[in-house]
């Protein structure tokens, strides 16, 4: 069986030698237990307000005041207490409120009042009108970019994920390298060209596109005591996270 990156939660601990990471990096953490899969007839939104939370996040993001990477990092910056007690969409709304204030779109007082208290930034041209929503959702946010950075690996190469795991540009910054993959050896399955590097883009340091690869790992290379050690896991990994095996 081959698994993609999404939804990889496991009862087993991470591979030996993996360092600790921030709370949001939950793949393979010990003690969280298995995640029961949703049934085929499960509703898209468990509660009505979940749909509104998604709509608010998309409409606010369309204002162009931050990147997707920055919004992810904003949610990662929630206090550990809030992160553990909030539901999925509560994390979204709390991170959204924080980033709206941080970027000057609104103020804390306006959040509390539930209305505008001063002249708002002129963002009317970026307003996501209803007739544009479907097109915006279907087109997504392409991250493929031209880059002068040379790809160091080819399909079939054996690679090792670097152990550092942290953002090398910003202390405590955003990283898309999951803890459970650090130090693991895998094989390059696909090369996707150069894509926006989240470690840089999340902090306003530019898109800094880097080569992006799909790397396949044996499950046993990621988790000791894997129930099905010959299963494979495929992760999309940027070049700065990799080194030759």
Name the predicted role of every residue range.
Residues 29-57, 95, 100-103, 143-155, ...:
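Basic/aromatic-rich interaction segments and small domains that mediate binding to polyanionic partners
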Residues 9-19, 134, 139, 145, ...:
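Short N-terminal segments
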């Amino acid at each position: 069986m081959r698994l993609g990156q999404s939804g990889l939660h496991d009862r087993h601990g991470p591979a030996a030698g993996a360092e600790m990471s921030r709370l949001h990096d939950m793949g393979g953490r010990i003690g969280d237990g298995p995640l029961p899969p949703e049934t085929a007839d499960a509703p898209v939104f468990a509660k009505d307000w979940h749909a509104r939370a998604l709509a608010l996040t998309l409409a606010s993001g369309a204002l162009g005041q931050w990147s997707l990477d920055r919004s992810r990092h904003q949610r990662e910056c929630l206090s550990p207490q809030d992160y553990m007690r909030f539901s999925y969409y509560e994390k979204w709304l709390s991170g959204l409120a924080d980033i709206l204030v941080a970027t000057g779109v609104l103020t804390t007082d306006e959040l509390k009042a539930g209305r505008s208290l001063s002249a708002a930034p002129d963002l009317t041209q970026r307003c996501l009108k209803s007739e544009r929503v479907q097109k915006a959702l279907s087109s997504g946010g392409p991250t493929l970019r031209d880059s002068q950075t040379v790809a160091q690996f080819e399909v079939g190469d054996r690679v090792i994920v670097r152990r550092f795991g942290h953002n090398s540009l910003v202390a405590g910054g955003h990283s898309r390298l999951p803890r459970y993959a650090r130090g693991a050896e895998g094989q390059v399955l696909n090369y996707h060209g150069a894509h926006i590097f989240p470690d840089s883009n999340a902090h306003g340091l530019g898109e800094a596109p880097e080569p992006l690869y799909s790397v396949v790992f044996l499950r046993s290379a990621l988790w000791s005591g894997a129930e099905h050690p010959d299963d494979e896991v495929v992760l999309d990994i940027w070049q700065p996270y990799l080194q030759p095996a």
